[in-house]
């Protein structure tokens, strides 16, 4: 993944909210001035082992790059939260091509 090139002004970053920061919410925050949006905290273990969970979040991220959303859907940073560094890396690899950055929280 290439380094993220951010706008000079990051005064309005849409912080993540659990179960709220999906594509429609991120689009609204971008429409109202946010220069960067985050996904909600995603479980890397569920991305790796739960096909339905993975497909839902892949569709959400693919929507960020679609023709209808490309000007508002990006940049987007995916957040991963887990307690197994190997699982965090596996989860990151599943989404890395659909986002502009990945943040992780090791708990």
Language-model segments: which ranges?
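Non-cysteine beta-strand/loop elements that form the S-adenosyl-L-methionine
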Residues: 39, 103-107
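Glycine-rich, positively charged N-terminal anion/phosphate-binding segment
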Residues: 2-8, 17-98
